């Protein structure tokens, strides 16, 4: 996607987590949950979160592109917030074979603490099931805003899938 002239592949950004108020997105503490509740229940605070997020993005957008692609893995947790503060956004959900996905996570040695669930197979399986359950909810509620991309289909038909995305 980032090779397209209207898209900037910004990498994995923390901006959504920052404006959500959650702190640690995987294991938020009580204060983080209260902050998040304030963001999603107050129109004024939600608008402030939108402004802060867009301001953070503007510092990246040096090429005046139309779209910025944030591929932070845990953004799936925040799709409800994304739809609230960025209703015009498009979301791409890249589905991958569960075994391939979990094995990749399990075998990777992450430097940050946000992927601790990936070092235990049972915990990883539970996390993956929760992830798919939550994505089912998001897809049901926001089906017109979420493009479900099958990774294997992308590998086998890159040109076709790329055209569908753009």
Label each residue range with its predicted role:
Residues 1-8:
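A conserved segment at the C-terminal end of the G1
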Residues 42-50:
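Generic alpha-helical segment signature
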Residues 50-55, 70:
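Switch/coupling sub-region of P-loop NTPases
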Residues 8-20:
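Short beta-strand-centered segment that lines the nucleotide-binding/catalytic pocket of NTP-utilizing
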Residues 19-43, 62-166:
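PAPS-dependent sulfotransferase catalytic domain
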């Amino acid at each position: 996607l980032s090779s397209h002239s209207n898209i900037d592949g910004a990498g994995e950004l923390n901006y959504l987590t920052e404006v959500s108020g959650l702190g640690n997105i995987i294991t938020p503490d009580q204060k983080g949950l209260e902050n998040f509740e304030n963001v999603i229940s107050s129109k004024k605070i939600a608008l402030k979160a939108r402004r802060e997020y867009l301001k953070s993005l503007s510092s990246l957008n040096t090429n005046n592109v139309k779209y910025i692609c944030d591929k932070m893995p845990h953004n799936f947790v925040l799709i409800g917030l994304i739809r609230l503060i960025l209703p015009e956004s498009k979301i791409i959900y890249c589905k991958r074979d569960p075994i391939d996905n979990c094995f990749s996570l399990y075998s990777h040695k992450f430097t940050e603490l946000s992927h601790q669930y990936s070092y235990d197979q049972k915990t990883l399986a539970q996390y993956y099931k929760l992830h798919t359950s939550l994505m089912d909810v998001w897809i049901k509620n926001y089906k017109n805003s979420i493009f479900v991309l099958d990774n294997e289909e992308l590998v086998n038909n890159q040109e076709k899938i790329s055209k569908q995305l753009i």
